[in-house]
Every structure is written in C-alpha cells, then in structure tokens.
Amino acid sequence: MDVVSSARRGPRQGDVWLVALDPTRGSAIRKTRPCLVVSPDEMNQHIATVIVVPLTTTVRAYPTRIGIHFRGKTGQAALDRIRTVDKARLVKKLGGVPEAAADEVAGVLVEMFTRG
C-alpha cells in the first residue's frame, strides 16, 4: 500500500507522521516534526486524537530515548515527550519504523507506566 492510500485510512501504530506540535508551552518539543504513533489501532480508528512520540536528532543519554533510524537520519524517539494530539495536527504520513523499533518503544512505554 502506498503512502497516499495508507494516509487516507488514518494513523496506525508504528507509523511516522509529520505533526504540527505548535503552539506549545514550557519545555514541550516544538514545531512541525516527525512523530511516531504509539496509540493502538483500535483507538486510532474510533477517537479524534492519537498518542505520539516526537522524533528528534538531538541525542540524549536518557533511558526514555530510543534510537531510531528513519529516512536516512539517525535520531531518537523521545518517549519522555509523549503527547496526545488531535488528528487535525497530522500533516502527512511519512512512513513507518521497523517492527523491532516499534517493539522496543512499546517495551519502554510499559516500563514507564508500570507502577512499582
């Protein structure tokens, strides 16, 4: 399936979308940038928002940052900057990450949100 037809079906977990993150406040990651969709597909199909993790080329040695290689660039998925955005902020689908990278992101999210 090409990017145009897959964009019509809406965001899916593991997709990378260009997302208009502004306006922001405080130290939130700003501007329009690639973001990894982490919300489950069933949720993405039925509600007007999607949970995303911004991708950044600014590398930090945080346990909440996962190395991602996307479109010839190496960077990180900034799980410490996770946010929910309205689908109206989704500009266009850029592609997706390999399943192994999506699994690693999901594993760290489970660790982040497990009480203990």
Q: Residue locations for each model-derived region?
A:
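Conserved functional hotspots at enzyme active or ligand-binding sites that engage polyanionic ligands
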Residues: 1-116
